[in-house]
Amino acid sequence: MSVNVLLDTDILVYAYDTAVESKRRQALEILDTCAKNRQAVISSQVLGEFAFVVSRKLEYPIKGEQLMLTVDRLAKSFPVLPVNAFIVREAVRGMEQYQMSFWDAQIWATARLNQIGKILTEDVPGQAYIEGVRYINPFEDWTLHGQSHEGFYAIA
């Protein structure tokens, strides 16, 4: 299966957040399915944001050695795309042209410049499709592989 999805930080965080059990289960299923089918990537930005959020903002933070093991597990499960100067420049353009925050624009730029057509995120912008990149909220109805699906069950 080819890589066609960039996972945003919130999908990873929900998998480790016990505050909303229904989203946690969905996020775990998404990660499991994407890892098994090798259809998703993350970026170095996503991995860094994940480490920050789960170590500081969860009810039960992940710290120290456990956090390092968790980051390693994610990096082994999903290819990690680096953020480079081209991505930063494209993010600046996206930020200005589409009124996105810089960090959201950088996620978009990473997907766009790596020819990844979908971003799984709960934070879908006003435009759900920007220059070849479709935003999909996997906790609602969404489309993957050109077919409409309900929820996360049919990601493969």
Language-model-detected regions and their locations in the chain:
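Helix-adjacent hinge/juxtasegments
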Residues: L58-L81
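Active-site neighborhoods of divalent-metal-dependent phosphate/nucleic-acid chemistry enzymes
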Residues: F78-E122, F152
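Short beta-strand segments at enzyme active-site cores
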Residues: V41-S44, T121
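Acidic, PIN/NYN-like endoribonuclease modules and their adjacent C-terminal/linker elements
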Residues: S2-N4, W108-A156
